[in-house]
């Protein structure tokens, strides 16, 4: 038995990690399985490249100021495009040629970019979820200094991905598959027997287990905050309806008093969650579910292969390994369609026109679940339009209780954010 670690040149996915217990011979392979893999990779490449390019081109056409979600979707589409170009495409070419065709420098560069795209895509999704957590659970903190809270979250995934991918440069190299055979390939080389197990375990923890744990914690807190918000809104709605029923049985002066009491609580609810925010939370949640569904089989097979010494290596297992490794790439195909599903403006013009023609009439929604100071005043005046005396009393009551400058500024910021998010999603 060869003293070198028996790790094949078959990467996973796209040549990112070495795979043990391969059934293909050292100097041959299963051609039928290779054809299936080439077909799947070609399909994934076309779908991922086309979908993410469509999203990038659509977002690039918008001339207005980009919202936070706009920027995160833009960069997540960039990372998914990187998965297609730097991970799927090299593996597709590699499967066609069977052996790596290139220099040692190109081998190390390809391996580095393959894992970099995986790290960047995962951590950008994590940053997007953290941004939604801040927007829902700590809205004022993210609104007072939006640039200082957004750009670090966008830059951090790229920086971490660039650093954490560096081991690939030292692990992989162009070397002989069997000493003295003269057949070269881009393979991993571990000096210790426990090296593959340690490396794959670390990669699984860094790319899948820990991010999923953080994502779950964030969405648990987000759901708790939304539940509290809905409970407060329900109670406020009951009090407001009770106040208007009192107005039906009382004089106009009683109405002015009830309106004055209701106004501060309605306006000062800066922390209420807009429908636009809830919609972006739903979109991010669906992306997270797709990410877990696509990557869970891949990392499960990877961990099984290095921790179970009795892992079978029959042909059927090789097929299962190969299909599981390719499933992770589907995440980059799903994300663009999730964006388009939550925002018809990102659809191609032909599909968007078809949806407009066949769909129902668009409904007009409020940009905020809680109106601003101006819209609240208009609502009160609309209900009281039949009484000049009541209009005067309401105006006087509004002028008699001025809002602090800081609160009004916060309200304007909340309204601006909701408008921006509604225009994109």
Curated annotation (Swiss-Prot):
Cellular component aspect of the GO annotation: dendrite; Golgi apparatus; plasma membrane
Localization per Swiss-Prot or TrEMBL: Cell membrane
Transmembrane segments annotated in the record for this chain: 36-59, 72-93, 109-130, 152-173, 203-223, 285-304, 323-342
Topology within the bilayer: Multi-pass membrane protein
Domain of life: Eukaryota
Cross-referenced SMART domains: DUF1856
Topological domain spans for side Extracellular: 1-35, 94-108, 174-202, 305-322
Glycosylated residues (UniProt): 21
Record region (Disordered): 1-21
Segments in the Cytoplasmic topological domain: 60-71, 131-151, 224-284, 343-425
GO molecular function: identical protein binding; peptide hormone binding; vasopressin receptor activity
Predominant location: membrane
Xref: InterPro entries: GPCR_Rhodpsn, GPCR_Rhodpsn_7TM, V1R_C, Vasoprsn_rcpt, Vprs_rcpt_V1B
Disulfide pattern: 107-186
Keyword Secreted attributed: no
Keywords for the protein's UniProt record, in alphabetical order: Cell membrane, Disulfide bond, G-protein coupled receptor, Glycoprotein, Membrane, Receptor, Transducer, Transmembrane, Transmembrane helix
Protein's job: Receptor for arginine vasopressin. The activity of this receptor is mediated by G proteins which activate a phosphatidyl-inositol-calcium second messenger system.
Similarity section: Belongs to the G-protein coupled receptor 1 family. Vasopressin/oxytocin receptor subfamily.
Name this polypeptide is given: Vasopressin V1b receptor
Gene responsible for this protein: Avpr1b
């Amino acid at each position: 038995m060869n003293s070198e670690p028996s790790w094949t040149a078959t990467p996973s996915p796209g040549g990112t990690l070495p795979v043990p217990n391969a059934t293909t011979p050292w100097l041959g392979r299963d051609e039928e399985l290779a054809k299936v893999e080439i077909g799947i990779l070609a399909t994934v490449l076309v779908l991922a490249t086309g979908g993410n390019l469509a999203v990038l081109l659509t977002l690039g056409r918008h001339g207005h100021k980009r919202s936070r979600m706009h920027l995160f979707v833009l960069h997540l589409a960039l990372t998914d495009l990187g998965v297609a170009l730097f991970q799927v495409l090299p593996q597709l070419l590699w499967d066609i040629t069977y052996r790596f065709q290139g220099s040692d420098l190109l081998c190390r560069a390809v391996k580095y970019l393959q894992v970099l795209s995986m790290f960047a895509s995962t951590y950008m999704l994590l940053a997007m979820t953290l941004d939604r957590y801040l927007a829902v659970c700590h809205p004022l903190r993210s609104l007072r200094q939006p640039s200082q809270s957004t750009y670090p979250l966008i830059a951090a995934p790229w920086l971490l991905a660039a650093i954490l991918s560096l081991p690939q440069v030292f692990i992989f190299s162009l070397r002989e598959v069997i000493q003295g055979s003269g057949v070269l390939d881009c393979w991993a080389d571990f000096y210790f027997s426990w090296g593959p197990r340690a490396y794959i375990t670390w990669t699984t923890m860094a790319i899948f287990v820990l991010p999923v744990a953080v994502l779950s914690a964030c969405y648990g807190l987000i759901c708790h905050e939304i539940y509290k918000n809905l409970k407060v809104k329900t109670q406020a709605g009951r009090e407001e309806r009770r106040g208007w029923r009192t107005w039906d049985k009382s004089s106009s002066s009683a109405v002015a008093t009830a309106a004055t009491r209701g106004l501060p609580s309605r306006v000062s609810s800066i922390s209420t969650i807009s429908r636009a925010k809830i919609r972006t939370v739903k979109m991010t949640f669906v992306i997270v579910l797709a990410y877990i569904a696509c990557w869970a089989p891949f990392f499960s097979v990877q961990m099984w292969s290095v921790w179970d010494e009795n892992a079978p290596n029959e042909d059927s297992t090789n097929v299962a390994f190969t299909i599981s490794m390719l499933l992770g790439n589907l995440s980059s195909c799903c994300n663009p369609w999730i964006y388009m599903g939550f925002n018809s403006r990102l659809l191609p013009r032909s599909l968007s026109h078809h949806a407009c023609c066949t769909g129902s009439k668009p409904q007009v929604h409020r940009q905020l679940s809680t109106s601003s100071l101006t819209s609240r005043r208009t609502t009160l005046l609309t209900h009281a339009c039949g009484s000049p005396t009541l209009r005067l009393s309401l105006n006087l009551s509004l002028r008699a209780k001025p809002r602090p400058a800081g609160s009004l500024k916060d309200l304007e910021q909340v309204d601006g954010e909701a408008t921006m998010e509604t225009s994109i999603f």
